[in-house]
A protein has these predicted regions:
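Beta-propeller and closely related beta-pinwheel folds
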Residues: 115-138, 142-250
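Surface loops and adjacent helix of pleckstrin homology
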Residues: 1, 10, 23, 103-104, ...
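Short, surface-exposed terminal/edge motifs of secreted or surface/virion proteins that either
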Residues: 2-22, 99, 148-154, 209, ...
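Beta-propeller domains
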Residues: 2-6, 26-28, 72, 126, ...
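Short, solvent-exposed secondary-structure boundary motifs
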Residues: 1-2, 74-83, 182-185, 229
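Autoprocessing Asn-cyclization modules and mimics
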Residues: 10-12, 17-115
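Short hydrophobic/aromatic-rich beta-strand motifs
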Residues: 1, 70-77, 131-132, 139-141
Length: 250
């Protein structure tokens, strides 16, 4: 993990065969749905090299429209509030209002200009996660340059899948779907490290240490809250676990 470059994984293919490859995240993670009046119009509902045209630049990348740093970024689009999302990955930028994308899950019917779209949370524009870990059969990541106190978790037992809901007209959210959570505090608490244990995930930030909790047995998209446990604050150094104790540098 590094905030300035996409996430990579190290693969062992044989006794002396190793490969470092970029992670191909599936369907996310995403920023909240567009709230501006700007619409997105795909030139087709399926295929590669499809133009994705904005009606304006307002509401996109701080009113800058498409940027060269959006290449590799995910897009979610739906025909309206009652239809399922499809998603795509930006492969090139033509102008501030036209991006070219490869569609991964088809959009519904014949696309029309709609405000119902979401942009990926991770990109050269928004930054990439600085840290990550595994907990409760999910891959967790945190702290981009634009969202320093946000965590993201993949779908359960699908470590590269950030699909936030089912691909159906109800956009059903199930317990094993991906999730994201932004720590609420009275000041910015950039996440420095994640330390998973047998029954808890400790989150070290610049202003304190936090624990995610749920009312049920496991954390789910609809059952999670992150509470502060201390106000010590953490240095940007990975902690060490000794039994059930987390040793970290302030």
């Amino acid at each position: 993990y590094h905030p300035d470059v996409p996430t990579y994984k190290l693969l062992r293919l044989g006794h002396a065969s190793w490969s470092l490859v970029e992670v191909a995240w599936e369907d996310g993670p995403y920023l909240p749905e567009n709230t501006s009046t700007t619409t997105l119009l795909p030139a087709a509902n399926t295929g590669l090299g499809i133009n994705m045209t904005l009606s304006a630049i307002a509401g996109v990348n701080d009113d800058q429209g498409w940027l060269a740093t959006d290449i590799g970024r995910c897009i979610r689009y739906a025909e309206g509030g009652s239809t399922a999302f499809g998603w795509a990955v930006i492969v090139s930028i033509t102008s501030t209002t036209v991006a070219v994308a490869d569609i991964k899950v088809d959009f519904n019917s014949s696309p029309t200009a709609q405000t119902t779209f979401r942009l990926g949370a991770w990109s050269g524009t928004t930054g990439y996660p600085s840290i990550g870990s595994f907990y409760e059969q999910r891959q967790w990541a945190a702290n981009t340059s634009t969202q320093p106190q946000t965590l993201w978790a993949t779908q359960t037992a699908d470590f590269e899948n950030h699909t936030p809901d089912k691909v159906d007209t109800a956009r059903t959210i199930e317990d094993d779907d991906a999730l994201d959570y932004t720590i609420s505090a009275d000041e910015v608490n950039a996440i420095r490290w994640l330390s998973p244990g047998e029954d808890t995930l400790v989150i070290g930030t610049t202003g304190g240490e936090w624990i995610p909790e749920s009312n049920g047995i496991v954390i789910t998209p609809s059952d999670v809250v992150i509470r502060r446990r201390t106000t010590l604050g953490s240095a940007n150094i990975q902690p060490v676990r000794v039994g059930n104790i987390v040793l970290f540098v302030q």
